[in-house]
């Protein structure tokens, strides 16, 4: 434990001064408006106090991380420091040096004890006791080192000029110290945003995050389904490709075999084709003469048909011209009607835009009225609760008063009855035993209840 407390890395690193921004601002994000607080400044005193305490802690840690430079280079700063500061710094350095030396001694002894585990038990116990004593002394030195660190820090805070000089002369901070400061600054920004956020915005943010998580889960499910489907499709495609490759290989083999046997068949077919060509040439000569005669006959028939169809063509052209003129008239009429409709549509669109603006204003008024209604409703609920509580308190007070009155009346009645019984007893005693005097103790006992009865009657 003591070794863990003493092993402190150097608090400065690098040659450039690392300035730490202690102010955070809200970054505007258009697509994430629900996650941005509506306020930009702290309004409550408690929040301002919290932020001031955190800023002061960050400033102190910033100075503490630069103290290692002051510890390693005390001669560079002695000329600019007062005497009490130099004295406190030297005491701090002496305590730190002794602490490091004792920690190294304790570490060496601990290693030696681990190496000599096979020695006698008594010697091991003695060494363990000595190690425990060294650890206790080391803890006291660690407490002294902590107190001296606080003293030096208090003196540094009391000298703002020395603080600025230390920040200028110190080369930088170690990665661990810089990481600690960055974490504190990040914590400050998070706390600042947390204090700016109202409970309503927290609920909206939680709802927004839940919606995004649900949407992400649904998208992930869809992605998983699509990936499974894609895997199945790829498997099917691979199987189909394998089948097609197998078929292609078989076709190649078959084609190779066909190519081997095709040469002989090609020669035979060539000879047969030459013979067939001669026969077909003769037959074609006969068919050619016959077709020429048919062509002459068809030409004469075609000429006759053309002459017959010219009259029908002229009639159809007249009909087509008439239909085209009617179509043009209809198109002009359609254009006029569409122009009127377009003007009417533009008028309606302008009216629609005006009504839409009015609707937006009404929605804003409705939102304001809803907020006012919720506030009034909350206030009425609080007032009704207070009124019910007051009525209950009044009922309890009335019951208590009636109970107290009943108890008091019963007590008065009992005291009156008791006094009457005593008077009756006195009358009977006087009649029976005249001349006999009671003892002094009995007389005193009788006088006491009489006095009590008189006080109650009053």
From Swiss-Prot:
Gene3D superfamilies to which the protein is assigned, alphabetical: 1.20.5.190
> Does the keyword Cytoplasm belong to this entry?
yes
Which portions of this protein are annotated as coiled-coil regions?
A: 96-137, 209-255, 285-379
Q: Where in the cell is it found?
A: Cytoplasm, Cytoskeleton, Flagellum axoneme
**Which intervals hold domain IQ?**
397-426
Q: Which InterPro entries does this chain map to?
A: DRC10 (IPR042815), IQ_motif_EF-hand-BS (IPR000048)
Annotated signal sequence is none
Instruction: Establish whether keyword Metal-binding is in the entry.
Output: no
Disulfide bond positions: none
Basic residues bias: start-end ranges: 446-458
Q: Where is this region: Disordered?
A: 419-458
Q: How does it assemble?
A: Component of the nexin-dynein regulatory complex (N-DRC). Interacts with CFAP52.
The identity of this protein, by name, is: Dynein regulatory complex protein 10
Q: Which organism is it from?
A: Mus musculus (Mouse)
Q: What is the lineage of its organism?
A: Eukaryota, Metazoa, Chordata, Craniata, Vertebrata
Gene name of the record = Iqcd
